[in-house]
Curated annotation (Swiss-Prot):
Binds 2 Mn(2+) ions per subunit in a binuclear metal center. This is UDP-2,3-diacylglucosamine hydrolase. CDD domains: MPP_YbbF-LpxH. It is found in: Cell inner membrane. GO terms for molecular function: manganese ion binding; UDP-2,3-diacylglucosamine hydrolase activity. It catalyses: UDP-2-N,3-O-bis[(3R)-3-hydroxytetradecanoyl]-alpha-D-glucosamine + H2O = 2-N,3-O-bis[(3R)-3-hydroxytetradecanoyl]-alpha-D-glucosaminyl 1-phosphate + UMP + 2 H(+). Its main location: membrane. It comes from Neisseria meningitidis serogroup A / serotype 4A (strain DSM 15465 / Z2491).
């Protein structure tokens, strides 16, 4: 059977065209074109201030994803902490299906829970409070009513503050909370969990389930997980 591919945390921006080039290379590969599905688990973009922002970056990415969709490859998207404002308009343009924060898939007989991963980092209480605020629908609606230029400036300011805070945060609170994560997996009756966000690429064999962490993309490295009937494995982009 055709494999499924999982990617996350590309953090695409005009400042890093090499990352966009990596993504386009993957999307144009024969492997992607022959996949049963591709799942993008958040932070595809480094920031997102609304579907009404039109740029060469956004347009080119949407165009290449749409080409895969038009070939019959199902493409799914889960919002991340950087691009949580991506809406149905952009997803329709790209031919992607927008998924909720948590979804359960039947992958080759293995019940698999997928999410971005930020909701699992419950020890970072300051972030969880911030997340709760910015995910309020009324606040998002008000933000999206602002002029695009204002939204861009606000997003840049928030990113600067977030970067400074991250430099002084203990590393352990920026990882998933093991007990909470295990409870979530059990609540969804899953055998496997796939998530991103922490940038700590690894396949963990936990008590009763497998937890697969997608890595971030940087320089000439792309973290791509292939899942098929034989299991799950990270495959270098060079093989595509």
């Amino acid at each position: 059977m055709k494999p499924a591919y999982f990617i996350s945390d590309l953090h695409l921006s005009e400042k890093h065209p090499e990352l966009t080039a990596l993504l386009l290379r993957f999307l144009r590969s024969s492997a992607a074109g022959q996949a049963r599905a591709i799942y993008i688990l958040g932070d595809l973009f480094d920031f997102w201030v609304g579907d009404d922002e039109v740029s060469e970056l956004n347009t080119s990415v949407a165009r290449e994803i749409r080409k895969l969709s038009d070939k019959g490859v199902a493409v799914f998207f889960v919002r991340g902490n950087r691009d949580f404002l991506i809406g149905q308009d952009f997803c329709r343009q790209a031919g992607m299906t927008l998924l909720p924060d948590y979804s359960v898939l039947d992958l080759f007989g293995c019940k698999t829970l997928i999410c971005h991963g930020d909701t699992l980092c419950t020890d970072d209480r300051a972030y969880q409070r911030f997340r709760k605020i910015v995910h309020r629908k009324r606040l998002q609606k008000l933000f999206l009513m602002l002029p695009l230029k204002w939204r861009t400036r606000l997003a840049a300011k928030i990113r600067r503050v977030s970067k400074m805070e991250k430099q002084v945060k203990p590393a352990d609170i920026m990882d998933v909370n093991a007990a909470f994560t295990a409870r979530q997996v059990r609540a969804f009756n899953a055998e496997r969990l796939i998530h991103g966000h922490t940038h700590r690429e690894h396949i963990h064999h936990e008590n009763g389930f497998t937890r697969i962490v997608l890595g971030d993309w940087h320089n000439d490295y792309a973290s791509i997980l292939r899942v098929d009937g034989d299991g799950a494995v990270f495959v270098p982009l060079e093989k595509y």
